Every structure is written in structure tokens, then in C-alpha cells.
Amino acid sequence: MLKDIMVHLDLAPSCKNRLEASIGLAKRHGANLTGLYVYSSPRMNQPVQQSAEVREMFEQQVEGAGVSFDWLEVDIGFERVGVAEMIGYYTSFTDMLVVSQPLKADRDKQYSVITSPERLILGSGRPVLIVPASGTFPHIGERIMVAWKAGPKASRAMHDAMPLLQAAKHVNMVSVEKTTFSTGEGERLSRYLELHKVSATTELIPPGDLSVGDTLLNLVADDNIDLMVLGVHISTKRGQLDMGEIGRYLLGQMTVPMLLSH
């Protein structure tokens, strides 16, 4: 069960939609919503005023929705710790972290302090729900698609998403591969989910002319999916953290929220 959801708050235009999505998710699961605002006062012109603006926005929307909440405000200006590490520390006391799809324009204007979703996913120890930077998503988790490929990544993501799967009206386990589900794997997967009170379908999509990422995005549109679940492996590539070609592509082209798990 989801009991406490953490939403990262900042000054970016996408914060409003991210907060609305978090409130809807908290109401759906009867969870507490923790708002986390991380900032660096030496880099800001009016840190106290900006912090007050973010807090007022958060409390007004949450109180209006009738959701229980907590507020956390952290100044890392004089700490020897990065933003992702600080967010990860506080996320370890919650069930899920909600952030927005990162946009270069937000970073350039210093709206948002998040520069690496990979670092958040790797360091939080919790599933990370990424909300598209544009659009509204009031009903997250009614129709869920899990990108499945037998192995630790997909298994961890499925388990992390279990409270969402149990509350969903429709769950589809999708594999875009030639061999998956060929030896009764689909039946075992369905049976396992059934034992957890999840009624799911399994679907094997043979690889075609489209990439795996585009195939998954097409399925999202065709099946009216409102949440995609994806397991990713974070590795170091040329000195930078990298979540792989498929994860990177989906993060850039996402049309619905994605729950990512490492």
C-alpha cells in the first residue's frame, strides 16, 4: 500500500501539473503527500520569498483537495551534498518520489535543480514517477502497461508498482521480443499477479520495423494507457550516468507518466 508519496517542488512551470498529478495519486490511494523543496540560497536572489511562494502553492492545492500532507524545506547552499543526494535521502522515508520530465529550458532558467533523473532513480531506493512536462494527468494508474522482459529490472519494477497494479482497472504486461512468453512464462506471470489480487493480460509484440520505444508508445496510445512501468539499469557511460537507449528515448518522448525503477 502507498502511505506516503513525496513530490519534488520547484519554480518550474511544470511544477503545477506535477503537483496536481501527485494529489490525484494520493487521493486515489489514501496516502499522505510530502512536498519537498530543495534550494541553494547563495544562488538565489530572494530565497525566502521564493520558498514562501512554493509552500503557499503546495499547501493551497493540497488543503483544497482534502489530502493530508507534510512540508519539507532544505537549503543545501552550505552543505557538502548534491541535490540528488539530498532528495534521495528524504525519499528513503517514503514510498515513492514524483518529479517532472526534465527540460533543458527549465535548467537554463534555473527553475529546477534536477539535472539528472538517472541519479534520482539510482540514489532514491524507491520507485520514481516521472510526469510529462506538459499535459494534465488526474487519473494515474487506472490503465497500466508494464514493459516486461524477464530479468531483475522488470521484476523489480513490477514489485515496486504492485500497489498501483492492485488498484488498477486494467493491467497489461507487454513484451517486445521474439522469445518471451514462449515457455509458459506468460501463464506463470499471470498466476503470480493473480495471487497478489491483480488481474492482468500478457501480450507479446514481435519486433517489427519500429523501435521498441516507439512500439511501446503506440501501445500506450492504442490502449488508452495512463501509466507505463519500466525497469531500467543505470550505468556509467563516458563518465555520465545513463539509463540505456530505450529508457532515454521514452523519457524524451513520454506522453503519459512513467514509473521507473532501478
Predicted regions span which residues?
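N-terminal positively charged helical leader segments and presequences
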Residues: N32, Y39-G77
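Active-site glycine-rich loop that binds ribose-phosphate moieties when present
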Residues: Q110-G135, P152-P163
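Small/aliphatic-rich secondary-structure junction motif
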Residues: M1-V48, G123, I140-P207, I225
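Short secondary-structure boundary segments
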Residues: Y37, Q101-P102, G231-H233, H262
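Structural beta-alpha unit
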Residues: V62-L97, K104, K197-M228, H233-L241, ...
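A short, aliphatic-rich alpha-helical micro-motif
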Residues: T91-S92, I121, L165, D222, ...
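Short beta-strand elements of ligand-binding domains
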Residues: V98-P102, S124-S134, M258-H262
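Charged helix-capping and loop-helix junction motifs
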Residues: S112-S116, E187, L217, D242-G247
